[in-house]
Amino acid sequence: MTARLNKIDCITYQIREIEENDLNNLLLVKNEVSVHTERLKQQGDGHAVYIGAFINNCAVGYVLLSLDNKEDVMPYTNNAKCADMIDLLIIEPLRNYGIGSQLILACEEICKEKGILCLGLDVNPEDNPKAKRLYEKMGYHTVGEIHLDGVYEYTDEQGNKGKYEDWCIDMIKFL
């Protein structure tokens, strides 16, 4: 993947592969060392590409492109290999400036370079309707039924612990 520079008004940001020395920056976007470490390992093993958006070398967003087959969409792809976009995240103040779109385009470019003709993702349509609209605008369409993607523990601002059920739909795009 070739790093590229983009502009938001007068701010220049760079889309590029994340490197191990970016770990401290990533913690400003999402404070989960083990998640980032595992993703860097997957990238090192050739199973994924971890792509970030950076302003002045500070991470402002990222996405993990899993190159392993997204098995749950196989019935909808005529068994063509389908990569999986996971955990697209942009820091709140910089959302709606096109950074997410550029990360998606970078994933699509990498897939094409690797001969992968389908790209999939999961999105929670109830909790994240803006993301679903973005994916639709970029040519992704829903396949299958809504499903429980995971149950995640959280702690709210008052320190109360709870569990969140992430009900998602699969979306795919043929490249």
What are these regions (language model features)?
Residues 135-145:
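Conserved acetyl-CoA-binding loop of GNAT-fold acetyltransferases
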Residues 111-123:
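Conserved GNAT acetyl-CoA-binding A-motif
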